[in-house]
């Protein structure tokens, strides 16, 4: 059985090495070790050193071959949220974030959450327009996410005041 042992972020892996795709919803894109079936019906073992969140367009590297399995975000029930102006959009984002709800920022400033009737009612009360449909969901990683080890550094500067 093929064994995928590492994750490569979208845009950082050689696309000519793609041998398969695997379509997974948001919940299934946070794994460490599990048997999966690619979109062509072939099984493989995901065997990562630690639980890792992978996104749409990332690749799972197959051990000992250099082959890549591209991850596709499955269409799932989502709610796209738009606001009449930027101040309202910031307020909506704050309210959604205050509920520790995964949220995707869309091009153009819209917001996407997994469809949840309670949250949809809340943002509508706050003046948002909501479009419910099925689409891939790739929320922001969050402020405390390590970014997959892609060169994230903390910097400390000391300021001397005399």
Predicted regions and their residues:
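Short, ordered loop/turn segments at secondary-structure junctions
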Residues: 65, 74-76, 108, 118, ...
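Glycine- and charge-enriched low-complexity intrinsically disordered segments
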Residues: 85-124
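General beta-strand structural signal in soluble alpha/beta enzymes
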Residues: 71, 105, 113, 130-133
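A common structural junction motif
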Residues: 64, 98-100, 127-132
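Intrinsically disordered, low-complexity, positively charged segments
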Residues: 1-51
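Anionic-ligand-binding alpha/beta catalytic cores of soluble enzymes and soluble regulatory domains
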Residues: 1-15, 22, 122-124, 129-156
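Conserved small/polar residues in nucleotide/adenosyl-binding loops
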Residues: 159-162
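Compact, glycine-rich, soluble single-domain proteins
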Residues: 29-95, 112
């Amino acid at each position: 059985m093929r064994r995928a042992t590492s994750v490569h972020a979208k845009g950082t892996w050689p696309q000519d090495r793609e041998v398969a795709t695997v379509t997974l919803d948001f919940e299934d894109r946070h794994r460490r070790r599990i048997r999966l079936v690619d979109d062509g019906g072939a099984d493989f073992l995901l065997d990562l050193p630690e639980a890792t969140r992978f996104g749409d367009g990332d690749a799972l590297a197959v051990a000992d071959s250099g082959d890549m399995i591209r991850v596709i975000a499955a269409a799932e029930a989502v709610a796209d949220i738009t606001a009449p102006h930027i101040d309202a959009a910031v307020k909506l984002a704050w309210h959604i974030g205050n509920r520790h709800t995964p949220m995707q920022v869309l091009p153009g400033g819209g917001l996407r959450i997994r469809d949840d009737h309670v949250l949809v009612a809340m943002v509508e009360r706050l003046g948002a327009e909501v479009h419910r449909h099925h689409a891939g969901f790739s929320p922001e990683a969050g402020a405390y996410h390590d970014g997959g080890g892609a060169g994230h550094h903390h910097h400390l500067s000391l300021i001397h005041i005399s």
